[in-house]
Amino acid sequence: MLDYTLIKRKLALSEEELQKLTPYRNMTLEQAAGDFLTQAAVERVLEKVITRGIDINRHIIGAIGTHLRAPRKNRETFLHLAELALYPREFAEKIAPSAGFRNALVHDYNNLDEATRNTKIGDVIKMYTDYAKYILDFLDQHRAADLLKAAQDRTG
C-alpha cells in the first residue's frame, strides 16, 4: 500500500532544499567545485534529493509494481516508473543517470565525466521539480482511484 504521507514529506523536503540552491542555478557543478563550501553544500543537497527520489521510486514499485522484477540498480528505479506510466520514457531516460551521479558523490567525486561536471545546477533543480510534479500527479490519481474503489466496495 502506498504511504502518501511519506512520499509527500520526502518531496516537500527535497523541494525546500532545492529552493535553497536557486542562487547557484546558473553555475555548473564544475564551477561550484571552485569554492569548498559551495561544493560541499551543493553536493550534499543533491545527494539527499536524489536519494529521496530513489527511496520514493522503490516505495512505489514495491506497492504497485509487483509485476516488475525488482530493480537491481538505483537508476533502474527511475526507468521502472516510466513502465508504470508515472511519467514519459524520455523523462525517465533523462533523470535515471542522476542515480549514477549520486553514487559518484557518495563514493568518489573525481570519477564524474565532463558532461556531468558541466551540468548546470539549475538543470538538476528543474529535473527534480518536474519529477515531484509527476509523482504528485500520480498520487492524486491513485488516491482518487482508491476512494472510488472504497465507495464501490461500500455500495456493493
PLM feature segments, named:
Residues 1-156:
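Solvent-exposed interaction patches of small proteins and small membrane subunits
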